[in-house]
Curated annotation (Swiss-Prot):
It comes from the Bacteria. Homodimer. This is Transketolase 2. PANTHER family: TRANSKETOLASE, TRANSKETOLASE 1-RELATED. The lineage of its organism: Bacteria, Pseudomonadati, Pseudomonadota, Gammaproteobacteria, Vibrionales.
Length: 663
């Protein structure tokens, strides 16, 4: 059957889906249909009957607005995505949302739409493939051996994150990464030469990529030859495909008119005629389905891999068991009891250290049990303290390590980590100063949206970092992280809470965790075994009064010590004061009503929250009658102790505020 005819099935489904939804983007799917046909029918190793097959090739549609392209491909190839699912494009509770979303349609490897993040996730997937291969493959046993393919448009390349990711991909020599640039010269505003005149091939050559320029994106032979050349090269490859947006539309192709709106009934009829597609809306002939189906070939490919894995298992039983455990995302045997023992030992051996140092100690203790750790930092390892004795850096020539030097690329780092998590086999953690999570915010939001594990270590968490001043002092960042749905945010007060936060982040497979640590030393608090167990609840009674409290002090992180000292003074003066440490408000909010009431009794309305961050967040815990000692402005450049005094983080101020409140 004519290959153009098979590609036209994508074009027909794409324009029909967008038309029925009365919204969407037909241009990119119609322009990239020929490339997709060659890649998916000739090269992509996948099994529609098992989208989770560990050694499948990964395909990422970075220009996610062209989602009807991937939905059409999944449907035609034989995934569980019906023609009715395609008719439900962009409708409530459908498997085909406006942008591809991980966890909806089978075969969607990542959520894309925010441009540039798909290619960055793909870099993470390719890094995971290369690292897993280095850790598990043995001579004659290549059980990890797959490619990561990406489609991306001009918008992805204009986004700064594409520079961060593609630069690192070149440095690390990710030869199994193959990207197709949909060079159609059109964006929403029109022809891109007015705002995007980069020499893209030279840009990627400068990154150390293999670049194949000027490929006719509508010529199957040229596309196929480019893919063959890409697969044979040890460098990551950019295939520059010249395409016509909206290919086949007589009056709208080649213009921004077909980028982000339905073609309209008349134009669709004219396009069908132009393409020689004689079938009605959403109608695909059986013989076209037969040519497209990847079920038989995919099952055979997976069966062949299963045979390879059985031979590997016979030769290396322990490694094979470990591979299965890691790919399934399971924690090692006895994880729970060993981790709890580590935490108990910390409580029994007090240390007044910075929580960033406590974090490093937790990495040291837990890292020995977790070969799946893949750490990193955005060029701040000596400050974030993210390296431990078992850390080994990844290098282009040796990927057997477990630590990535991301360079100063916070956004790239975080989105790469999403790709590593999506690929499987690793528990990724990365780090920067809390202030610079701002650069990475959208990638953390994507982790929360996709429900993937992404552990961020954010150090230097307040005005407590001192002299570097307000450019580096976070104020509103902690609150903004807490406000993000499905984000777990921890601000521990000492080494014990820090270790608990790490343990829970490692166990949390259905969303990201932000672990927030101090630069300055923090005093360790006394606790019973029951109190240690209650840390996991996110908020607990750390110090209590004799009898019912008349005042509750709620604090996090570096301010817990302050709350305890103020409570001691108030208690000495005859006041009944309870101190609540609340390292994770999201965890506390998930506790049942009885527990929350036991910690914060509703009839005790005299409450003060103390945190060196924005004040507004805390009203939900102290009420309108309560008080908040926090930040209402940006910080200043000065030694930390002077700043804490200036902004009211003193025992004297807490005591005076309490007396005013109780009066």
């Amino acid at each position: 059957m004519d290959r153009k005819h098979l590609a036209n099935a994508i074009r027909a489904l794409s324009m029909d889906g967008v038309q029925k939804a009365n919204s969407g983007h037909p241009g990119a799917p119609m322009g990239m249909a020929d490339i997709a046909e060659v890649l998916w029918r000739g090269h992509l190793n996948h099994n529609p009957s098992n989208p989770e097959w560990a050694d499948r090739d990964r395909f990422v549609l970075s220009n996610g607005h062209g989602s009807m392209l991937i939905y059409s491909l999944l449907h035609l190839s034989g995934y569980e995505l019906s023609i009715d699912d395609l008719k439900n494009f962009r409708q409530l509770h459908s498997k085909t949302p406006g942008h591809p979303e991980y966890g909806y349609a089978p075969g969607i490897e990542t959520t894309t739409g925010p441009l540039g993040q798909g290619i960055t996730n793909a870099v993470g997937m390719a890094m995971a493939e290369k690292a897993l291969a280095a850790q598990f493959n043995k001579e004659g046993h290549d059980i990890v051996d797959h490619f990561t393919y990406v489609f991306m448009g001009d918008g992805c390349l204009m986004e700064g994150i594409s520079h961060e990711a593609c630069s690192l991909a070149g440095t690390l020599g990710l030869g199994k990464l193959i990207a197709f640039w949909d060079d159609n010269g059109i964006s929403i505003d029109g022809h891109v030469e007015g705002w995007f005149s980069d020499d893209t091939p030279k840009r990627f050559e400068a990154y150390g990529w293999h670049v194949i320029p000027a490929v006719d994106g509508h010529n199957a032979e040229a596309i196929n030859a480019a893919i063959e050349a890409a697969k044979a090269d040890p460098r990551p490859t950019l295939i520059c495909t010249k395409t016509i947006i909206g290919f086949g539309s007589p009056n709208k192709s080649g213009s921004h008119d077909c980028h982000g709106a339905p073609l309209g009934a008349e134009e669709i009829a004219a396009t069908r005629k132009e393409l020689g597609w004689e079938h009605g809306p959403f109608e695909i002939p059986q013989e076209v389905y037969a040519e497209w189906s990847a079920k038989e070939a995919g099952a055979a490919k997976e069966a062949a891999w299963n045979e390879k894995f059985a031979a590997y298992e016979a030769a290396y039983p322990e490694l094979a068991a470990e591979f299965k455990r890691r790919v399934n995302g399971e924690l090692p045997a006895q994880w729970e009891e060993k981790a709890n023992q580590i935490i108990a030992d910390l409580q029994a051996n007090p240390a007044n250290i910075a929580s960033r140092k406590a974090s490093q100690n937790a990495l040291e203790a837990f890292g020995k049990m977790l070969p799946e750790f893949m750490g990193g930092s955005a060029d701040l390892a000596p400050s974030n303290l993210t390296m431990w004795s078992g850390s080994k850096s990844l290098e282009a020539s040796d990927f057997s390590g477990n630590y990535i030097h991301y360079g100063v690329r916070e956004f790239g780092m975080t989105a790469i980590m999403n790709g590593i998590a999506l690929h499987g086999g690793f528990v990724p953690y990365g780090a920067t100063f809390l202030m610079f999570m701002e650069y990475a915010r959208n990638a953390m939001r994507m982790a929360a949206l996709m429900k993937v594990q992404n552990i961020q270590v954010y150090t230097h968490d307040s005005i407590g970092l001192g002299e570097d001043g307000p450019t580096h002092q976070p104020v509103e960042q902690i609150a903004s992280l807490r406000l993000t749905p499905n984000m777990s945010t921890w601000r521990p007060c000492d080494q014990v809470e820090s270790a608990v936060a790490w343990k829970l982040a490692i166990e949390r497979k259905d969303g990201p965790s932000a672990l927030i640590f101090s630069r300055q030393n923090l005093a360790q608090q006394e606790r019973t075994a029951e109190q240690v167990a209650d840390i996991a609840k996110g908020g607990y009674i750390l110090k209590d009064s004799d009898g019912k409290p008349e005042l509750i002090l709620i604090a996090t992180g570096s301010e817990v010590e302050l709350a305890v000292k103020a409570a001691e003074q108030l208690t000495a003066e005859g006041k009944k004061v309870r101190v609540v440490s609340m390292p994770a408000t999201d965890a506390f909010d998930k506790q049942d009503a009885a527990y929350r009431e036991s910690v914060l009794p509703s009839d005790v309305t005299a409450r003060i929250a103390i945190e060196a961050g924005i004040t507004d967040f805390w009203y939900k815990y102290v009420g309108f009658d309560g008080r908040i000692i926090g930040m209402t402005t940006f910080g200043e450049s000065a030694p930390a102790d002077q700043l804490f005094e200036m902004f009211g983080f003193t025992v004297e101020n807490v005591v005076n505020t309490a007396k005013e409140l109780l009066a």
